[in-house]
Every structure is written in structure tokens, then in C-alpha cells.
């Protein structure tokens, strides 16, 4: 199987359903939803992402959810660098990715049968 076929298979078999589930979680940013902790949507989103990532077979990967009172959780995923580098130090291959799990408030104007928390794939 070539790289493009592998990516398509992983996308279709492992990612699309997770995205659909994520879309259904009305996890509004705490900047717009004072009751975000009480509602529990952030916890559902964190669990979804944490569990999906934990299911990947990546050597040496560790996953930790860090929490501070009154703040949104932080998922820290550490994957050690490996392989040769020009300096011989794998630590030179550090990459940092950052993202967030909260969403902006929903807007109006959706077509019939569509909405911000309803995943739809249109061909």
C-alpha cells in the first residue's frame, strides 16, 4: 500500500468518526460560556482526544492531562525524538504543536437539517 492509500485508509477508518463525535460536543469557549465546567463538554472533548491519541501505536508516547482549578485542561503528549541528526543529538528534532478543543458560539443561518453540532459529509 502506498502512502496516499495509507493516509486515505487512516482518515476514513480512524479519523472521520472521531471528528463526527467531536462536532456533536457543544464545547463553547469559556470566554462565551460561564458554566463550561458545570456542563462538562470540555471534559468530553478532552476524553475523546486523549483516548484517541492513546490508541495510536507510537513508540515512547506519553499522554498526560494537566489541570488547574478554573482553567481548561491541557493535554500534553510527548513523543521522544529518534533517529540521527546532523549534530547527532535527537533532541535537536523537537517539534511543538498547539491547539484548542473549545469552539466559538454557534451562529444562525444554517440550512434546513444542518447545525453547528450536527456533522454532515456532503459529496
Language model features with spans:
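N-terminal capping segment at the start of a domain
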Residues: 2-40
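Tryptophan-centered motif/residue detector
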Residues: 11, 22, 36, 52, ...
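A non-catalytic alpha/beta surface segment that caps or lines the substrate-entry region
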Residues: 32-92, 115-119
Amino acid at each position: 500500500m502506498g502512502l496516499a492509500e495509507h493516509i486515505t485508509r487512516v482518515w476514513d477508518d480512524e479519523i472521520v468518526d472521531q471528528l463526527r463525535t467531536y462536532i456533536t460536543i457543544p464545547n463553547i469557549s469559556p470566554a462565551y460560556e460561564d458554566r463550561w465546567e458545570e456542563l462538562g463538554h470540555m471534559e468530553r472533548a478532552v476524553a475523546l482526544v486523549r483516548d484517541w491519541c492513546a490508541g495510536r501505536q507510537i513508540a515512547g508516547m506519553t499522554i498526560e492531562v494537566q489541570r488547574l482549578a478554573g482553567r481548561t485542561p491541557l493535554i500534553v503528549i510527548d513523543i521522544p525524538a529518534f533517529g540521527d541528526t546532523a549534530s547527532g543529538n535527537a533532541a535537536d528534532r523537537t517539534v511543538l504543536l498547539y491547539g484548542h478543543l473549545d469552539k466559538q458560539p454557534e451562529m444562525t443561518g444554517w440550512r434546513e437539517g444542518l447545525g453547528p453540532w450536527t456533522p454532515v459529509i456532503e459529496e
